[in-house]
Amino acid sequence: MDYVKLGKTDLKVSVACLGCGGSSALGVTSGKSENESVNIVKEALNLGVNFIDTANIYGTEKIVGKAITNLNRDEIVISTKHQVTTNKKKYSLSEVINGLNNSLKYMDIDYIDVFHLHGVSPRDFDYAMSLVPGLLKEKKKGKFRYLGITESAPVDPEQITISKAIDTDVFDVVMLAFSIMNQNAKKQILQQTSKKNIGTMSMFVVRSLFSVPGRLKDEITKLVNDQKLPKWLLDETEPLEFLLKNSGAKNIIDACYRYARHQKGIDCVLFGTSSIEHLKNNIKSILSPQLSLATVKNIDQYFNHLKGVGLDFPEKILK
């Protein structure tokens, strides 16, 4: 496993970060037993992953807690999150703090390494900032070590929230969407996070766009019809197979993880899974060498103008 320092924090994290939400949610959404889900986390730890990301809304914090029982807490980096708003309500400071306390209880830990404000949309950013002073008081109590923020990628393709967050100099860590077909963060944001030494976690690297059969082909067809991609892409037997020629990648998902992993400004790559087989494959991809320079050039040439592609909410969101 490769490890990096997460921005200006003193956290040394694995470049592969196990995401416990999304459509996979450690197999919870596909009916796996709690023990099976716990074993996925344990196997990730056995393979050198020391960075685990969850959230109160995922319903997987208790699973994470059981997986890390009796392990050296100082060797594991835990990231969790709480929403500040939903479509129906705004969470008060006391409700967010209660969520923080519940996270500690569910995982049976004394502190959280990174506590994020979760899925903050641009319209809710100011409200999220109003909660920060109160949360920093909880930080002083030792409940969490670093404050982070994650964007709501499906409603914020311009990544306005992360841009604003960087300007506040309040957040130690940010989580943003980045992929082969969604490179918006390269234009300014990654330069800004690097300049300010803000820890940067990448999500939406694969998601359903690349993992659900037929989804990528449908998206490419739509983009070609909208004149955003060249027509010859429709002539390929498999979607984006031209990228794999002499790239070093085994398949498009392998290419996705490798592209994100070696993007300057990104510290770690989040991946989700519901099986140990996929867990091993994902980690292997993230630890593989950079794609060939010619392949990277093609990715940048054909897709760097796209925005908001592949940014969809998980098909199942746990309540």
Where are these regions (language model features)?
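Alpha-helix-loop-beta-strand connector modules within alpha/beta enzyme cores
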Residues: G65-K81, P133-K143
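Short, well-ordered coil/turn segments that N-cap beta-strands
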Residues: T9-A16, G48-F51, N72-I76, I109-D113, ...
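Structural motif corresponding to the early beta-alpha repeats
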Residues: L71-S94, H118
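N-terminal binding-site loop/beta-alpha segment at the start of enzyme catalytic domains
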Residues: M1-I76
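Conserved, mostly hydrophobic/aromatic
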Residues: L6, L18, S37, I52, ...
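Glycine/proline-rich, positively charged
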Residues: T29, K42, K88-I180, N184-Q188, ...
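Structured C-terminal cap/extension of enzyme domains
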Residues: I40-L45, Q188-K319
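Active-site beta-loop-alpha junctions enriched in small/polar residues
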Residues: G21-S23, A55-I57, K81-T85, L117-V120, ...
